[in-house]
Amino acid sequence: MSRNVDKSQTVLALYQEHKAESRRDYNRYKRPRVESVRDPAEAREWYKQTLREVGECTNRLYDPLLSEEQVRECNARVNQLIQESQRWSRHLRRFKQRQRPPVYGGVVVNGVRYIGRARELPEARKRPTAARQFTVKRAKYVDFSDNGDFSDNGDYRGTSERLRKAHGIAQQESVLVEPPTQQQMEEYLVERRKRQLLHQLNL
């Protein structure tokens, strides 16, 4: 009995998919392989459909009723859809058609994007501490000139002045100092060695 029901449901699904394909209903029938689509307009419709599904799955990832396993599965599905949408986007570029790249949001850890509640998963929190500190350090200290880049003539005084003011470092007066002579260096080294020996002997 169940076999007949499954068979009838399969036949019905195939029939509905065939009708949707004939009507070009991009919401109902199975997506073809990216490389098999030769019509730019059809490729664009499939691209839009993948983006809609990405949006639906992303909204679901904010559902507080989902279990941890459901969140993990839904996030994996979002990543699959994002990869598929990127393949459609590259395929459209072959037809000389460009589109604005979408902003997916979330965080990327080890090549996997975590969105919504998926950011609370244990694997999403495995971002190396050193990498976080490096990012914060760069964001805090790296600065650029007004035109967005350092000038070609090597003039970095303006940038240095802004950095000193930002971190409360007072500008010190420049003083020219004569470099020590060879004899002065030798006397200094002998004196330093003598102090080290006296310290070791507790004298």
From Swiss-Prot:
It is found in: Cytoplasm; Nucleus. Gene3D superfamilies: Helix hairpin bin (1.10.287.660). InterPro entries: Helix_hairpin_bin_sf, Isy1, Isy1_sf. GO terms for biological process: generation of catalytic spliceosome for second transesterification step. The keyword Phosphoprotein does not apply. Keywords: Cytoplasm, mRNA processing, mRNA splicing, Nucleus, Spliceosome. It comes from the Eukaryota. One of its GO terms (cellular component) is spliceosomal complex. Involved in pre-mRNA splicing. Associated with the spliceosome. PANTHER family: PRE-MRNA-SPLICING FACTOR ISY1. Belongs to the ISY1 family. This is Pre-mRNA-splicing factor ISY1. The gene is ISY1.
